[in-house]
Amino acid sequence: MIYVDLPADLNLEDDQGRNIARLSDAVSPEAVTPGAVLVAGALRAWSWVVVEALDSGFVYFRQVSAHEAARRGSLVSPLPRSA
């Protein structure tokens, strides 16, 4: 089962083509740091993502393949606190 770390509308992009989400929506905001690999989106439409920047309460990230996400670290993590 997939747990979404960062609820987001994956159709919402900035002028640089990065996706945007609110940091306050993250399951564990302290885990959302530049370079972090997360699952973003919704249960019906999600993606592996890499966080690029945090600014004024917003998270800027790009979607990546599972292969690229796995190169950055384990894709298996403990259950989130909200599970």
List PLM regions with ranges.
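Short, solvent-exposed loop/turn positions at domain surfaces
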Residues: 25-27
